[in-house]
Amino acid sequence: MKAQLRALIGQGIEALRANGTLPADTLPPDFVVERPKTREHGDFATNAAMLLAKAARSNPRALAQALLAALPASDDVARVEIAGPGFINFHLTPAAYQREVIHVIKQGHDYGRGLAGNGRSVGVEYVSANPTGPLHVGHGRAAAIGDSLARVLDANGWNVKREFYYNDAGVQIENLALSVQARAQGLTPDSAGWPENGYRGDYIADVAKAYLAGDTVDLEGHLVTGTKDPADLESIRRFAVAYLRNEQNHDLAAFRVDFDIYFLESSLYKDGKVDEAVQKLIASGHTYEEGGALWLKSTDFGDDKDRVMRKSDGTYTYFVPDVAYHLTKWQRGYERAITELGADHHGSLTRVRAGLQAMELGIPQGWPEYVLHQMVTVMRGGEEVKLSKRAGSYVTLRDLIEETSADAVRWFLIARKPDSQLTFDIDLARAQSNDNPVFYVQYAHARVCSVLRQAQEKGLKYDQTHGMAELARLDDEHSLALMLELSRYAEVVELAGQTLEPYQIAQYLRELAHAFHTWYHNSKVLVDDAAERDAKLTLAVATQQVLANGLELLGVSAPEKM
């Protein structure tokens, strides 16, 4: 609908150029067509006249009047009026919204999908948890946001690759191996001789038990078997990493999160990518040596201080493999790279970008893009839940899914802006009431399915083609309000892709569900008149389709019964 109005406005601008109101060489401005904050100001508004006023040497309201007069007639527009300093407000006809219902029915699963990405490549990295323990609720928020963002970008026409980066080469992996070894040797976290920075959760005992039993882990087709030798630290390291990666994959599968690429930090060293990145930086002239260390002149690229790349002992600082990793993304042809991280990692953003810019490879400023999420507080019975016995120090994603459901966890972890603190209320997530937003939205979908079953049980034939032809019968307040909400869906999907904010889909679905429940309570659907009944069922089915499409973008199921 917005595209149709933009086309009308464009034709009006051409008419003003043709009649001399605008100079012939006036370029069409980048005007907006948007929904006003209040319905009293119409269904859509544009600022086109305000942007063109200078070129026309006219005040904006006078030019708005001229543009209004030059607009072609449209069956979708009931009236047009000027407001404020020169906004043009459009009031649409009921037929415009009724036709949108037909678009939903005909396009089905594809309704709301766009072409903004035009098949261009984007890599979306998310979760990227260290393989040192179970996924916690923070990883869950990263998974929910990142996976939904990938779905939204796909719906906007981007060629999306989903990527998980494993930090499998750092000190934490050494601490993991030592912890499992200690358990395998019969020690407990309270024993003398327990590693100073060891992991204390019960899961360490599970890993040690599996290792000593000679279990085999199938990690994406690669088999890793415990050698049963508690003295073989390298074998313990390999087995523990494989075991915990497999556990994380199990949790992610239960959470409906998939990846196309699993990238290992260790491969950067094995394949020489870290050395390659360092040599490119040295060759660019943006490094220097001081105190036996190699430094990057990162202050030349917006950092608050220069950064050590290679310490005097010859080892690299942690941000160097991060730069090398993102260099591989550029080399793999990603036009855009988006990384979803916890807000506690914000300090690394400037350093990684500085390292990439310093290579002088033509990498755009602001590449990669980042989406940062804040912490999650878990509540039960009005009190904060802080610990999991299995993990030892945090609430795991598996705990939340088992206590509520994958649907509820995904919804609640997505439904607020990523940069806002989030409270996950277990009691609310389990509630089967309208106060629970995921229940409220899913129930709207299930309610349509129930109505269709009732029609079938009563022997009432539903003719969808007839229903689409009879939509003009539905011109009451609640029907039109529901149609208006349906017409917003494609705009919300596009906006969520532009802003990298899938939470907007969740907000929209609540509003759509509210419009549907209001319509349902004020409109008997299975009436005796076949034409009216078919029209109402068609509106209900269109709502069902949009709810299903939107829930799919969030990775939440659309149940037929509740």
From Swiss-Prot:
A GO molecular-function descriptor: arginine-tRNA ligase activity
PROSITE patterns the record matches: AA_TRNA_LIGASE_I (PS00178)
GO biological process: arginyl-tRNA aminoacylation
Keyword Protein biosynthesis: yes
Key words, A-Z: Aminoacyl-tRNA synthetase, ATP-binding, Cytoplasm, Ligase, Nucleotide-binding, Protein biosynthesis
Motif ('HIGH' region): 129-139
Presence of the UniProt keyword S-adenosyl-L-methionine in the record: no
GO CC terms in record: cytoplasm
Catalytic reaction equation(s): tRNA(Arg) + L-arginine + ATP = L-arginyl-tRNA(Arg) + AMP + diphosphate
Compartments it resides in: Cytoplasm
PANTHER family the record matches: ARGININE--TRNA LIGASE, CYTOPLASMIC (PTHR11956:SF5), ARGINYL-TRNA SYNTHETASE (PTHR11956)
The family this protein is said to belong to: Belongs to the class-I aminoacyl-tRNA synthetase family.
Listed name of the protein: Arginine--tRNA ligase
Organism the protein comes from: Xanthomonas campestris pv. campestris (strain ATCC 33913 / DSM 3586 / NCPPB 528 / LMG 568 / P 25)
Taxonomic lineage of the native organism: Bacteria, Pseudomonadati, Pseudomonadota, Gammaproteobacteria, Lysobacterales
